[in-house]
Amino acid sequence: MKYLTVGDLEDCLLNKVDLRRQQISQAVEEVQKVVHHLTTNISNQDIRFQAVPYSDTYNENIKVLAPSQFLVTVPIKGLAGYREAREQHWRYYTLQGTRLPCPLRDPEGLQQWLEVEQFMKSLWQWHETDVNIDGDIVPAKVLLVFRKLVENAVRTCHLSGKVSLLGNRSAVWVAVETSAYQVELELVPAVEIPTTWSKKARWPRCLQRWPSQERVECIKSFGFNLLACSNYHWQLSFLRAEQVLLEQLDEDGGCRRKCFQVMRHLKEDIWCPGNRPVITSHHLQTVLFWTCEKYPHFKDWQVFSKAFLRLVRKLHKCVSQHFLKHYFVRNSNLFQCTNPTELDTVAQKLATFLKNPQIGPP
């Protein structure tokens, strides 16, 4: 069994982390060709959905949550000039068109309503009853339309042998066969809101020392997305802002990214393996951001072993408490809908690791 030494770090990074990067890059390359083909067909069927572009470098529409689990955001077209809702009002509708005696619950944390009137410009199709109820663009109805378009696209593009729609899920999931293994994709329609920062994201906090104020303004300029992944409420997402923050971690020469990469490798190989793990790369990324904020100085990230174990202790604390705040929207818990038993299993593995830190299985 190996202990955390400089030599082990080099071995882990070169032989494990780099190998993972190559495998993931190959999978992303194959997946994005399929996604571009599918979404181009979908866009031709319905102007409200935009094709996911093909990219030779980083594709901001594809987020790797685990080696075999990707999140793919499909841009929504025909909604421009977003503004925050001016006033709140009760909703009494159902997805079936009946009226409720009591109002629907208000959105919490990362959720919000979305009214078509919140946009200065909108295609007339967004006012149609297939996606709109009482002026609200309803994510469940958008997903229903989108799922049918995906089904048609799989048939039309002759991808039935390579792509299969996964049923019995409220979201739209497809399985894609790559040359190495099967990857499950969650295809999520997304309203992209560039240059505007959500009022729900009260960030940064007062007296926060990381990142710098200049970097904060840069990150906020990337805006946010609204994802259609529930019945009535849209979910806030900051994928672009998070990616920029992740890319610019170590300008001072620290080892933050190395710590993250090794932690992700151990999570995927030992602590929480599997196709749809309870802990994803996004959770690890959030733990990293919180730790960087608490330890903002270069001196805190000079020695890998100390910095890495500090990061793992933070992860263990969050998993044990079943509580991980979103980095930008702090009144939300990213573990709220996760399986507590699975979290406890991961917490036990992390506790064992921290008692005797090792970078590989027996």
From Swiss-Prot:
Signal peptide bounds: none
InterPro entries recorded: Mab-21-like_nuc_Trfase, Mab-21_HhH/H2TH-like, MAB21L/cGLR
Family, per entry: Belongs to the mab-21 family.
Name of protein: Protein mab-21-like 3
